[in-house]
Amino acid sequence: MNRDDPRLTYNHPYKPYDIQVQLMDAIYDTIQNKYKVGLFESPTGTGKTLSIICSSMTWLRNYKKTQDHSTMGSNSSNDNDPNQTSDSDEEPDWVKEAHIKNIRSRTSGLAIDYERHLEELSQTPHAGHTVELGQRTHKRKKRATNDDDFLPDDYNSDTDSNSVETKNAKLQQEINQIMKRVDGSDGKTPGFVNTCPVTIFFSSRTHSQLSQFAHQLSITSFESSLGEIAERIKFMPLSSRKQLCIHPKVSSLSSVSAVNDACVELQQKSDKRCEFMPRVNNPESDQLVQRFADYSFAVIKDIEELHELGADLKVCPYYASRRNIENSEIIALPYQMLLQQATRKSLGLSIKDSIVIIDEAHNLLDVISSINSVSITRKELSSVIASLKLYYNKFTKRLNSGNRIHLMKLIKLCSLVETYIKNCEIQNKCVPGSDVLIDELFQGSTGDLLNIHRIEKYLDKSKIAYKIQTYIEQSREESDEKQASSPLLFKVTAFLKSLVNPSKEGRFFWDKINDDTEIKYLLLDPSEMFRDVVESARCVLLCGGTMEPVEDYYRYLFPYVPGEKIKKFTCGHIVPQENIEVLTVSSRKTTVFDFSYHKRNDPSMLRELALSLQDICERVPNGIIVFAPSYKYLNQLISTWRKDGNLAKISTLKQVFLESSDSTSIESILRDYGAAARGSGAILFSVVGGKMSEGVNFSDELARAVIMLGLPYPNAFSGELIAKRKFIEETTLSKGGTQAMAKKNSREYYENICMRAVNQSVGRSIRHANDYSVIVLFDTRYNSSHIQSKLSGWMRSSIRPERESFDMTLERIADFFAAKTLTKR
């Protein structure tokens, strides 16, 4: 097979490696043959993102060519009534074919005209084409904040026709009207011409990962579905108001919730309406939105560039970007937007028959649970109650009766929950993992006074949380009081809402956070929340660098999908076998390395571990990364070695760096470590699950060795894990399983969390084809075939099956780097 043919390499911008072609083959096959779910593991550094882009976009362009706009003919009539008989049914076939051919020709011609239009725009800086609305010609004056800014609209009753709810509904109608007007506002870009028959949704965890995706997409191009003329990739990144808002005052707010509420409030007030918001029945505004849409398609843009485009054109990028949703071939969006049905609905985002690609999917189970889970501690409740009382006392005379009554009910409700926690503490009921009995919480309370549904509706419709939070923040600024790291009132609001609508797949339970008591609502069964995505989409592709072990996805994410509709593919590493050495260390002399909970602090083992690290430091050039199972254990190690002098001995061989739990110091530590590693050498002690193990890539001299200390099992005594394992056992038994099976499934889940963390941490080390590294796994349990079966495939294939002495391990390390030195010569 000639892999130089771009059609056989999926239009990859470079000559792909064999493993990249294999991955692209697997993805294309999954989409083409309508598998419902695809699981793809491609080790970090193997060009996974480009492989995903090239295979999926090649399929889409091929699909568009075969469709040949054939749906256009059927869309032109009888769309709303499929049972209606058309006059054309009586016409001869040649007449129908001629009619459809005429429509295809016309729509194809318009699409080609639009491509030419985009080509012209791509040559012209958008900043020079700003259209100023008449009302925007004056210079904006900064308005001083006064107490009126902190007052909510009058809130009269739940049925008032002039209520905030009515205003919100009217506002949504206006937004929809704007988008519909724009869809037909320019003859060059009628919506039905450019609507993509299938949309690719790419979702990832972080903003930076989505930006990286946009940059990778920008270096690709694909065969046109329009014939001779080049066809641009129609890409649209979506994000929150917090990322896209260009209003100076609103965008400076501290949280996503505050920005959302402030945005809605500005749209409701005629005298303070956001000047960047698209307007109804305003041709100039329609023109701006259309211009924004065209420029965003002319050149691929990430979120920052989309924000800049909106600022230059003086139109809200959050709302204007909706114009391109139907016409996009690829949409990039964060997990929260994709995985929450209500969010997709509010954006007008349909994933029906689409291709959904979820990157970094190794943490998908946790992500789905976390975005549907909330918690509150007793101390947080106390702080919120104090804030509510402060606000109420300040503004009580200026609030109408509706606001006063509902605020008092909110204060009473928060006080009720706080008192319940205090009483349970006294009675020793707050055992981590044990159920919180919500019925007990409201026992003896006045139902009318504490109608949670009405309070929840008031919080949702009045946006009072934003008003109170901004007032409290300003009060703290004026008094130089330190602000909380996250707006607590929004957190309490989310918790109270969970009391109203708890999912049957979730559970309320107790937990302990330091010396504070927490009530947590946790989604225990993410499969039902994910079902809507799986059943709506054409196919869902879960991709990641470290997907092993995969059993949990089958069991807890899509148990309702038949096995024959799931495709699993694991590709090898881009790095040749001779560039990887995976070694297990069970013992040194007579000391066995066992980092299980009850043995990890054995003094003789810690001493032998320090000596082992010194031996490895003498044989490994440049940088070494050591992963400990937790910050607490790392601190214990360092403290012990400081006292016995072993840390000083290690520091004579490599400059020592420690990961801090304070994320603000990460960049400076990495910078200094990198300089030392490339120089005389350095060793970085890091933590599994910390910043270094998740988001940082260690290539070349930064990680000539990666050392894993023990198996990083999560805290078995955390309330969350106890509740989850209990749920797994109950579910197994409810399906007819035995007690032994229930315990086994619970143990497997616990073990799989640990092994995914191992794979994720080790996977940060080797980044490209010429990279090389030694991986050393310290713990006798790594010699178990059961544990080894859960390692990433590329590690399993490199691990030595036989147990060896530590001296032999050192010899292998020395030989490995000696061979690399000879190769360089």
UniProtKB/Swiss-Prot annotation:
Record: residues binding ATP: S42, P43, T44, G45, T46, G47, K48, T49
A GO cellular component annotated for this chain's UniProt record is: nucleus
**Which Gene3D superfamilies does the annotation name?**
P-loop containing nucleotide triphosphate hydrolases
Q: What is its main location?
A: nucleus
Which SUPFAM superfamilies does the entry link to?
P-loop containing nucleoside triphosphate hydrolases
Please cite one Gene Ontology biological process associated with this protein. Answer: establishment of sister chromatid cohesion
Cofactor binding comment, as recorded:
Binds 1 [4Fe-4S] cluster.
Q: Which cofactor does it need?
A: [4Fe-4S] cluster
Query: Which keywords does this Swiss-Prot/TrEMBL entry list?
Result: ATP-binding, Cell cycle, DNA-binding, Helicase, Hydrolase, Iron, Iron-sulfur, Isomerase, Metal-binding, Nucleotide-binding, Nucleus
Annotated localization: Nucleus
Give the Enzyme Commission number. Answer: 5.6.2.3
Catalysed reaction, written as an equation: Couples ATP hydrolysis with the unwinding of duplex DNA at the replication fork by translocating in the 5'-3' direction. This creates two antiparallel DNA single strands (ssDNA). The leading ssDNA polymer is the template for DNA polymerase III holoenzyme which synthesizes a continuous strand; ATP + H2O = ADP + phosphate + H(+)
Broad EC category: isomerase
Q: Where are the compositionally biased (Polar residues) regions?
A: 69-86
The family assignment reads: Belongs to the DEAD box helicase family. DEAH subfamily. DDX11/CHL1 sub-subfamily.
What is the protein name stated in its UniProt record?
A: ATP-dependent DNA helicase CHL1
Q: Which organism is it from?
A: Meyerozyma guilliermondii (strain ATCC 6260 / CBS 566 / DSM 6381 / JCM 1539 / NBRC 10279 / NRRL Y-324)
Record gene name:
CHL1
